[in-house]
């Protein structure tokens, strides 16, 4: 990881945790990360039902409270959706955009993901944009075709936003929740290519400012090798983030 980019370790709780469970988690997490300011950024992406409580508890701590999704319009007849202004209103400062589960289960497209990323930046939310390929696409030699198309769609819609205002998370879909993990070398290959594409599309400054995460069955046993890769700036963590103890191990590993 480049020294000038601060690592980011992000917990994605997915559809887990009640308000009480979220309170207990944050009460255990916050004292342990209080001394990490300036060394590691920590984010917690919570379900909508407990997001306001996570944001309330995180206020002033340096921990980013984030949502797992939102819609790109600010208001209107969009039953079941929430908007960027609504997230800001409850204290969220970031949002995951385009997670593979959203793309697969809820039919999100490169176009809709790009619109969400642009709206997040406009509203002042930090988008964590997920990109990645299926096992079939990888086996067919189409990994880079898929990932580069996803990245291009987002970057071309960002206007003049700086690289520091967007995060990309490479999550090989075949490694999410399966116990399979891309090798550290595979993670670096994909993420290094993404940084190269950002450089091609937006220049050196944008590419060097943007933080690029790895996501896909991250756990304490493999995080150190992954974080040792020069272009990997942190992790988007699913299952291993549900227990505060294991997530703290990942945060400590990112600290170096």
Swiss-Prot record:
Q: Which domain of life is it from?
A: Bacteria
Give the residues annotated as active site: 99 (electrophile), 171 (proton acceptor)
Example of a GO biological process term: glycerol catabolic process
Spell out the reaction equation it catalyses. D-glyceraldehyde 3-phosphate = dihydroxyacetone phosphate
Top-rank EC class of the record's enzyme: isomerase
**Keyword Cytoplasm in annotation:** yes
The catalytic activity of this protein is classed by the Enzyme Commission as 5.3.1.1
Q: What is its main location?
A: cytoplasm
Alphabetized InterPro entries for the sequence: Aldolase_TIM, TIM_sf, TrioseP_Isoase_bac/euk, Triosephosphate_isomerase, Triosephosphate_isomerase_AS
Q: Which GO terms describe its molecular function?
A: triose-phosphate isomerase activity
Record keywords, A-Z: Cytoplasm, Gluconeogenesis, Glycolysis, Isomerase
Annotated substrate binding sites: 12-14, 177, 217, 238-239
Q: Name one Pfam family in it.
A: TIM
Subcellular locations according to the entry: Cytoplasm
Known Gene3D superfamilies for this protein?
Aldolase class I
Q: Which family does it belong to?
A: Belongs to the triosephosphate isomerase family.
Subunit structure, interactors included? Homodimer.
Protein purpose? Involved in the gluconeogenesis. Catalyzes stereospecifically the conversion of dihydroxyacetone phosphate (DHAP) to D-glyceraldehyde-3-phosphate (G3P).
What is this protein identified as?
A: Triosephosphate isomerase
- Please report the organism this UniProt entry assigns to the protein: Rubrobacter xylanophilus (strain DSM 9941 / JCM 11954 / NBRC 16129 / PRD-1)
Name the gene for this chain.
tpiA
């Amino acid at each position: 990881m480049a020294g000038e980019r601060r690592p980011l370790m992000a917990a994605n709780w997915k559809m887990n945790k009640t308000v009480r469970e979220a309170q207990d988690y944050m009460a255990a997490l916050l004292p342990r990360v209080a001394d990490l300011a300036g060394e590691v950024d920590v984010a917690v992406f919570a379900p909508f039902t407990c997001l306001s409580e996570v944001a309330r508890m995180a206020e002033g701590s340096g921990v980013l409270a984030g949502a797992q999704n939102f819609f790109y319009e600010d208001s209107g007849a969009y039953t079941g959706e929430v908007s960027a202004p609504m997230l800001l209103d409850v204290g969220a400062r970031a949002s995951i955009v385009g997670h593979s589960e959203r793309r697969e289960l809820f039919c999100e497209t490169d176009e809709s993901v790009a619109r969400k990323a642009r709206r997040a930046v406009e509203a002042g939310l930090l988008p964590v944009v997920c990109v990645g390929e299926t096992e079939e696409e990888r086996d067919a030699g189409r990994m880079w075709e898929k990932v580069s198309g996803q990245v291009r769609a987002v970057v071309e819609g960002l206007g003049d936003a700086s690289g520091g205002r967007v995060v990309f998370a490479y999550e090989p879909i075949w490694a999410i929740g399966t116990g399979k993990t891309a090798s550290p070398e595979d993670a670096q290959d994909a993420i290094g290519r993404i940084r190269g594409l950002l450089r091609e599309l937006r220049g050196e400054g944008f590419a060097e400012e943007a933080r690029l995460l790895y996501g896909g069955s991250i756990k304490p046993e493999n995080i150190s090798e992954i974080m040792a890769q020069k272009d990997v700036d942190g992790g988007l963590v699913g299952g291993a983030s549900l227990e505060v103890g294991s997530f703290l191990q990942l945060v400590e590993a990112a600290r170096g």
